[in-house]
Swiss-Prot record:
E.C. designation(s): 2.7.7.18
Protein name listed in UniProt: Probable nicotinate-nucleotide adenylyltransferase
Catalytic function, reaction form: nicotinate beta-D-ribonucleotide + ATP + H(+) = deamido-NAD(+) + diphosphate
Species assigned in the record: Clostridium perfringens (strain 13 / Type A)
Keyword Transmembrane helix among UniProt keywords: no
Pathway: Cofactor biosynthesis; NAD(+) biosynthesis; deamido-NAD(+) from nicotinate D-ribonucleotide: step 1/1
InterPro entries the record matches: Cyt_trans-like, NadD/NMNAT, Rossmann-like_a/b/a_fold
Lineage: Bacteria, Bacillati, Bacillota, Clostridia, Eubacteriales
Function: Catalyzes the reversible adenylation of nicotinate mononucleotide (NaMN) to nicotinic acid adenine dinucleotide (NaAD).
Length: 202
């Protein structure tokens, strides 16, 4: 059975940390493919503060160009209304049929997992893969993982990855302050930021 990773996010902008996480998940879990799923109208974030979805899609598409095992899906962008994870996973499950899905997300999401809508469907349609993030204690995360495993009769995969302390927020702030960002971004993404004059002071 084909194994497909699903890596969702706002990607505003996508950076080398995202690429590293997706690659490590691909390698460690022996996935056949990782699908990047840029968020359309994410329920957990303020819509007015997010770059236009078409531009974010363009940045992700450019960033993953060199990798044959990465792809991009526009389901959440094309979908009208709020985008919830369980709906995305259900759509992919129904679209691909005979596949095993691995939903890749950060430690912050594990901490707040009980607030997610229809969490049982997330476990029904996918294997949850959680990677560590700066500021989160590994032992606390593993304890939380065990609690969710028992509560939902599942087996969350924990990836203990190298902490790359780069965030989209940091990059946006550096652009606003006219500081260099090209070393934090995949090739071509800086050009798109310049093309649309993103993140700069108005």
């Amino acid at each position: 059975m084909k194994k497909i990773g699903v890596f969702g996010g706002t990607f505003d902008p996508i950076h080398i940390g995202h690429i590293y996480i997706a690659y490590e998940a691909y390698k460690i879990l022996e996935l056949d493919e990782v699908i990047f799923m840029p968020a359309g109208n994410p329920p957990h974030k303020k819509w007015k503060d997010i770059t236009d979805e078409i531009i974010r899609y363009e940045m992700v598409k450019k960033a993953i160009e060199p990798y044959s095992f990465f792809s991009i899906n526009n389901y959440e962008i094309e979908k009208k209304g709020l985008s919830f994870t369980y709906e995305t996973l259900r759509y992919l499950h129904e679209s691909f049929k005979e596949v095993e899905l691995y939903f890749i997300t950060g430690a912050d999401c594990l901490v707040n997992l009980n607030s997610w809508k229809n969490i049982n469907e997330i476990f029904k349609f996918s294997n949850l893969v959680v990677f560590n993030r700066p500021g989160f204690d590994k032992n606390d995360l593993l304890k939380r993982k065990e609690e969710f495993d028992r509560e939902y009769c599942t087996n969350i995969v924990y990836l203990d990855l190298l902490n790359i302390e780069i965030s989209s927020t940091l990059i946006r702030e550096r652009v606003r302050e006219s500081l260099e960002v090209k070393f934090f971004l995949p090739p071509g993404v800086v050009d798109i930021i310049d093309k649309y004059n993103l993140y700069r002071r108005e």
